[in-house]
Design a protein with these regions (language model features):
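Walker A/P-loop
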Residues: 42-79
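Canonical AAA+ ATPase core
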Residues: 94-99, 120-124, 132-224, 264-269
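C-terminal engagement/docking regions of AAA+ P-loop ATPases
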Residues: 2-7, 11, 241-325
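P-loop (Walker A) phosphate-binding loop of NTP-binding proteins
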Residues: 52-53, 87, 155
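Walker B catalytic acidic pair
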Residues: 52, 115-116, 127
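Pre-Walker A (pre-P-loop) alpha-helix and adjacent loop at the N terminus of AAA/AAA+ ATPase modules
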Residues: 9-56, 235, 239
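Conserved beta-strand position immediately N-terminal to the Walker
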Residues: 48, 112, 150
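Conserved alpha-helical scaffold flanking the Walker A/P-loop in AAA+ ATPase domains
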Residues: 36-40, 93-114, 142
Length: 325
């Protein structure tokens, strides 16, 4: 049974996330589903990977979300000569004090926009690993905590694009979700010409929240109830990827945690204090697909991981309420 305070928290979450989505959609035309997923990842304490060809608005979406929530934001342009210390920071000698002091890197921000992350070397890409999972950075044996909220929104071009490096499996697994922007519909593209021709909409975008508000929203989403049968459903879906003959690498235990958190966030955004199977099903592909590697036979048959997941959704039994539950 939902208490009055829980109901009020959910109501406030619906109101604020609606305002955030409206603010971002005032800049990003014709992509409401992508914007909704980005906000879901934010509430689920995850990180978002935006993958698509250049020029479809990946970086613009990341900047718009950061500005709409009124949090500190740093942008990292990933290039082949970018160093790990540029991301994490490092010790710099202070001549006045005659001692080394820590200079924070670009990762010390609420929102980190990693632009074209797969253009940097794997060594530099891996500099994000600790910060993404543990919300901390260790430099020269000293650990520095990152202040919440903390979200990495990384963009990458398809791997067949020139000058790109594939993201390691360990790093892909740390992104809660991946989404492709796609080209906008004709009407949205015309609206973009009108809107961006007159002024830069990002420059006039006003924040509709702040860091403290986002922290409260995250806590509200985390408290959403998930019944045991829902948790078992999530585990069944994840384990099904590991036994599928179409996949040579299935989903990790971390992916089950990400799927559960994202489902709770989606439920809260729909005004509910409990998770439904629909919440899980809606997020299976964006949360799991980028972690999976197809088998050789699946590649020959052109069966992408997203297609395999769609098939698993049709075969894994839906959860049923237990007698007396």
């Amino acid at each position: 049974m939902t208490t009055t305070s829980e109901a009020q928290g959910i109501e406030a979450l619906v109101h604020v996330t609606g305002a955030i989505r409206s603010a971002v959609e005032s800049v990003i035309d014709g992509k409401p589903d992508v914007v909704r997923l980005a906000v879901t990842v934010l509430l689920g304490e995850g990180h978002l990977l935006l993958e698509d060809v250049p020029g479809v608005g990946k970086t613009m979406l990341a900047k718009a979300l950061a500005r709409s929530i009124g949090c500190s934001v740093r942008r990292i342009q990933f290039t082949p000569d970018l160093l790990p210390s540029d991301i994490t920071g490092g010790s710099v000698f202070n001549q006045e004090r005659a001692e080394f002091e820590f200079k924070p890197g670009a990762v010390f921000s609420n929102v980190v926009v990693g632009d074209e992350i797969n253009r940097a070397s794997p060594k530099t890409q891996s500099a994000l690993l600790e910060s993404m999972e543990e919300r901390q950075v260790t430099v020269d044996g000293t650990t520095y905590r990152l202040q919440p909220p903390f979200i990495v929104i990384a963009t990458q071009n398809p791997i067949e694009m020139e000058g790109t490096y594939p993201l390691p499996e360990a790093q892909r697994d740390r992104f809660m979700a991946r989404v492709s922007m796609g080209y906008p519909p004709p009407a949205a593209e015309l609206e973009m010409l009108e809107r961006h021709g007159a002024h830069d909409p990002l420059a006039t975008l006003e924040p509709v929240a702040d860091a403290e508000t986002v922290r409260r929203l995250v806590a509200t989403a985390r408290a959403v109830y998930a019944a045991d049968v829902i948790k078992e459903y999530v585990v069944s879906l994840v384990r099904a990827t590991r036994s599928s003959p179409d996949l040579r690498l299935g989903a990790s235990p971390r992916s089950a945690l990400h799927l559960m958190r994202a489902a709770k966030a989606r439920a809260a955004m729909h005004g509910r204090a409990h998770v439904l199977p629909d919440d899980v099903q809606e997020l299976v592909v964006p949360v799991l697909a980028h972690r999976l590697l197809p088998s050789a036979d699946a590649q020959l048959a052109r069966r992408a991981p997203a297609d395999v997941l769609t098939g698993l959704l049709a075969t894994v039994p839906l959860p049923r309420a237990r007698p007396g539950a």
